[in-house]
Amino acid sequence: MSELFEKSMATLELPQVLALLADCAATLEGKERCLALRPLTDLDDVARAQEETSAAVKMLILRGSPGFSGVKPVSASLQRADMGGSLSTRELLDIASVLRCARGARDYGDSEEKTVISHLFRSLTPNRFLEDSITNSILSEEEIADSASSELASIRRHMRSTEARVRDILQRLISSNQSKYLQESIITIRSDRYVVPVKAEHKNAIPGLVHDVSSSGSTFFIEPMGVVKANNELRELMAQEKKEIERILAELSAQCAAHKEDIGEDYTLLILLDTIFARGQLSLKMEASQPGLSERYLRLRGARHPLLDKKKAVA
């Protein structure tokens, strides 16, 4: 665009109008696309864009918003997965979110009445199997479900029973006459091992391994010899758990890579729909109407600047 054109757009306050439009978009890329919009010069392009907006307005009135807030950027993640990389829980959840939004939008767009944007909804390819595989395995960014695999469930059962055994041994120590040697009657963890806080002057009264000392030097965190074997078992189980989680994430990543084309296309379509429905929402907010188009002239009847209050504007 020429400098004169940009100056004209600034004078007409187009950037402010586009900012209002961007506020109506639900996705980050949708907002960016709204801000980057410039006036169309081809009459056919203008007519198509107007029809898209009008179709979105009608659907918003009849069905409400399709909801695009769950659409997260996934292109970089899909590319890395395609190269054999293992994705993080956050990346996999974002991909599942895109698939969920694609499924919701596809259902939203199902209608006997065809519009100029119907083909966009029909082009979406939800993958419920992959979506469920991810969401059933990953409960949150920090938590993998026990049910993610039978191996993980088995490892965690053993971890819980071993941990209970360690705690039981330490609880008996805390409840015995040896408790007088403790700084506090609690069980704590140092270096992934269960320990008890022992007074410095009695550190030799409880045989075991010292894993830490308080900054004041008054407390020694000791792993009693009676729990060393069980703690070792627990450490081994934790390593097995970590390895199995890595395997699960790698497997889910490979599944995403296998469907990267469809997922990427869904993302592109959802961003496009987000911008179209942003136009529809702003149209409703401004109480705008679709104009008739002509190649020969421009006739403004009852027109007003969209930033002016309708009640105060003089048409």
For each predicted feature, which ranges?
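Conserved amphipathic alpha-helical "coupling/scaffold" segments
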Residues: 1-151, 155, 259, 266-280, ...
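Gly/Lys-enriched N-terminal cap/neck module of very large, oligomeric protein machines
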Residues: 17, 192, 196-213, 218-222
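Active-site phosphate-binding and catalytic loops of NTP-dependent enzymes
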Residues: 82-88, 110-116, 169-185, 275-289, ...
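Extended, charged coiled-coil "arm/hinge" scaffolds of SMC/Rad50-like chromosome-maintenance ATPases
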Residues: 126-142, 229-250
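Extended, Lys/Arg-enriched charged tracts that mediate electrostatic binding to polyanionic substrates
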Residues: 153-203
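Intracellular alpha-helical coupling/juxtamembrane segments of multi-pass membrane proteins
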Residues: 155, 159-162, 241-248, 252-276
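Conserved NTPase motor "head" modules and their coupling/switch loops across ABC/AAA+ ATPases, GTPases
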Residues: 196, 261-315
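Conserved mid-sequence domains
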Residues: 220-222, 227-229, 233, 238, ...
